Each structure stands twice: as structure tokens, then as C-alpha cells.
Curated annotation (Swiss-Prot):
Component of the cytochrome b6-f complex, which mediates electron transfer between photosystem II (PSII) and photosystem I (PSI), cyclic electron flow around PSI, and state transitions. The 4 large subunits of the cytochrome b6-f complex are cytochrome b6, subunit IV (17 kDa polypeptide, PetD), cytochrome f and the Rieske protein, while the 4 small subunits are PetG, PetL, PetM and PetN. The complex functions as a dimer. This is Cytochrome b6-f complex subunit 4. CDD domains: cytochrome_b_C (cd00290). It comes from the Bacteria. It is found in: Cellular thylakoid membrane. It is a multi-pass membrane protein.
Amino acid sequence: MSIIKKPDLSDPDLRAKLAKGMGHNYYGEPAWPNDILYMFPICILGALGLIAGLAILDPAMIGEPADPFATPLEILPEWYLYPTFQILRILPNKLLGIAGMAAIPLGLMLVPFIESVNKFQNPFRRPIAMTVFLFGTAAALWLGAGATFPIDKSLTLGLF
């Protein structure tokens, strides 16, 4: 006996269902509850056990060990935090920087209410939302690029 039950094509009922395009899943075991309750957890636990075993038996280092005596001149965050880092760096008052970062999501939440009279779903026919999106994208790219420059050239990107 094999693992997969082969269909009995001599059965007239099955042949009639197959002729109508039905019955392709008529034979065999159902996925619920057999596979979902029993086989899937076994596979998931086996994969997690394999990953844990490999991590214990052959741990790989993630980068170089830290050297407290070799600190860079300016410590930069990860690339996706550059715009917020730049906002906090250029504003003289830190509370003003935090309030500015909190105002960004609040302003974004107001856009649907401002443009509620516009019934179009096409973004090119919604000028306020499109303008806010393009301005926000340009500002985030500008601030992100400026975070890599020294503080005196960060707003102009060294261009002016």
C-alpha cells in the first residue's frame, strides 16, 4: 500500500464527477483535521528543533566584537532612522524635535479629513494627498541624505 490513495477510475460515480470537473478532491484523506492538527505542528516543531540545534552546535558570529577603545568620531544610527536622527540633530531644542516628530503622524491623520470631499480613489486625482506624499518623500530623502554630512553642511547637503 502506498502513501497516496490512488483513485478507483472504474467507479462510475467518480468517473461521472470527474467528467463534470468535480470530484478531484473527492478521494483521499481530508486536510482537516488530520494534516492541520497533526502533521503541520510536527513539521513546524521539527524545523524549529533543527534551527535551534544548528544554532547551538555551530553558532555563527554576527559581525565583529565591539572594541570600547576604538570609537568612531560620529555614531550614526541605522539608515532607516536617518531622517529622525537629522530632525533631532538640527533642531536646537530637543523637546521641539520630539514635538515635531509627533506632529508628523498627526498631520498625516488629518489628510483624509481635509480631502473628504474628493470621491476619487485614483491618487493622481487627489491633489492634497499626492502633494503631502511627494513632499514627505522628498523631505525624508533630503533629511536622510543630510544625516550623513557634518552638522554644518547637513541642511544644504554641501551644495550651497
